[in-house]
Swiss-Prot record:
This is High-affinity gluconate transporter. Keywords: Cell inner membrane, Cell membrane, Gluconate utilization, Membrane, Sugar transport, Transmembrane, Transmembrane helix, Transport. Pfam families: GntP_permease. Part of the gluconate utilization system Gnt-I; high-affinity intake of gluconate. InterPro entries: Glcn_transporter. GO terms for biological process: D-gluconate metabolic process; gluconate transmembrane transport. It is a multi-pass membrane protein. It comes from Escherichia coli (strain K12). NCBIfam families: gntP, PRK14984.1. The chain crosses the membrane at residues 2-22, 23-43, 52-72, 108-128, 134-154, 174-194, 222-242, 258-278, 292-312, 327-347, 349-369, 370-390, 418-438. Pathway: Carbohydrate acid metabolism; D-gluconate degradation.
Length: 438
């Protein structure tokens, strides 16, 4: 019966979001309320569970996402992202242009949300395709693959970070494992798959992009741009490595754990960026503060939706669904990684939103960790992989890709939807293989 109620809740969520076009946050809270009542929870307990779910999920997550958005916005506004892109492409040359685009997308993707990175790199992709006389998708697909993998696999992006919070996974290890799996995944979904699509040769659409192009003097140096944007990654990776190789009681371990905490790592990066991307570029504190304020507007609704997913998750836990799923897992031989991936994949195809699919699947799959002893970090990547599968017409990202690359719906499915599916399947296979050795 508990699983039937969960299924009803998921169907209700789909109806509210797809049929009635309801805001994701409101829909998630209403579904959490409905599932709690159907499970027989008292009214006051349901409300308390929803509050606890929102608060527990957004506790440190709001700080991480807030600081991450600030870092990304400063990187974009000062021309740092453009500097990274143009320098890498100049170094690689036309023959290896796909790899330059992949590396650029991967580097930029660490600091920027997918949509921001996508729009930011488009002029560069258009310029490369025109100057090298190559099909647009030949460089567009590697760019999209790199951005999508960082968005689905790696903290501090919203989906992986929120799932890591739900699963109580170590952010540093999640980042480390995610990076290991991301590299072959990007290669297959990007440069390799792009060669299959060389027959789709569409002209660059006119009038779709009018963002600022920075002059040489306006942009910070390549080294400053790269190292400032990668500060959180370096600090979190340092913590993960220190915890693996240093004995307990080592003097450096507390320092590494403090500096590598995701909140501290992103805060330190923002403080450095305020100087390297702001004061050092001649910007006033008022201008820097305007950038910081505008960055939060970008993620405000995203934070609420994630909080709503946390509320749904908490109701499932407090109503006993987690224990029911845990008991079921004792009677099945299905890999918890495969099950978590499948839940996220079904929700992704039905809902369209990778973030909502990831958060909802995280709440449903959370009991599997305690029951099976599977690595919570690999579970984060499994859910993240499932949440990006087969983007189609109910996903805004589908239409973003279609319009900017001047494609038909069929061509978008062949390129974008299949690209996302390759990423999803590679992520699952990678998790299953990595699970054998850790």
């Amino acid at each position: 019966m508990p699983l039937v109620i969960v299924a009803i809740g998921v169907i209700l969520l789909l109806l509210l979001m797809i049929r009635f076009k309801m805001n994701g946050f409101i829909a998630l809270v209403l579904v959490a309320l409905a599932v709690g009542l159907m499970q027989g929870m008292p009214l006051d307990k349901v409300i308390g569970s929803i509050k606890a779910g929102v608060g527990g999920t957004l506790g440190s997550l709001a700080l991480i996402m807030g600081f991450g958005a600030m870092l990304g916005k400063m990187l974009a506004d000062c021309g740092g992202a453009q500097r990274i892109a143009t320098t890498l492409i100049a170094k690689f040359g036309k023959k290896h242009i796909q790899w330059a685009v992949v590396l650029t997308g991967f580097t930029v993707g660490f600091a920027l949300f997918y949509e921001v990175g996508f729009v930011l790199m488009l002029p560069l992709v258009f310029t490369i395709a025109a100057s090298a006389n190559i099909p647009l998708l030949y460089v567009g697909v590697p760019m999209a693959a790199a951005l999508s993998v960082t968005h689905g696999f790696l903290p501090p992006h919203p989906g992986p970070t929120a799932i890591a919070t739900i699963f109580n996974a170590d952010m540093g290890k999640t980042l480390l494992y995610g990076t290991i799996l991301a590299i072959p995944t990007v290669i297959l979904a990007g440069p390799v798959y792009a060669r299959v699509l060389k027959g789709i040769d569409k002209p660059i659409p006119e009038g779709l992009y009018s963002a600022k192009t920075f002059s040489e003097e306006e942009m910070p140096s390549f080294g400053v741009s790269v190292w400032t944007s990668l500060v959180p990654v370096v600090l979190m990776a340092m913590r993960a490595i220190a915890e693996m190789i240093l004995p307990k009681g080592h003097a450096f371990l507390p320092v590494a754990e403090f500096l590598g905490d995701p909140v501290m790592a992103t805060l330190i990066a923002v403080l450095i960026a305020m100087f390297t991307f702001g004061l050092n570029r001649g910007r006033s504190m008022d201008q820097i503060n305007d950038t910081l304020v505008s960055s939060i507007k970008i993620i405000a609704m995203m934070l609420l939706i994630i909080g709503g997913g946390g509320a749904f998750k908490q109701v499932l836990v407090d109503s006993g669904v987690d224990k029911y799923i845990a008991s079921m897992m004792h009677e099945t031989n299905i890999s918890p990684l495969l099950m978590a991936w499948s839940i996220a994949a079904v929700l992704r195809i039905a809902l369209g939103s990778a973030t909502v699919a990831a958060i909802t699947a995280g709440g449903i799959a959370a009991p599997l960790i305690a029951t099976t002893g599977v690595s919570p970090e690999l579970m984060v990547i499994a859910v993240g992989s499932g949440s990006v599968i087969f983007s189609h017409v109910n996903d805004p990202g589908f239409w973003l890709f279609k319009e900017y690359f001047n494609l038909t719906i069929g061509e978008t499915i062949k390129s974008w939807s299949m690209l996302e599916t390759i990423i999803s399947v590679c992520g699952l296979v990678g998790c299953l293989l990595l699970n054998m050795v850790i």
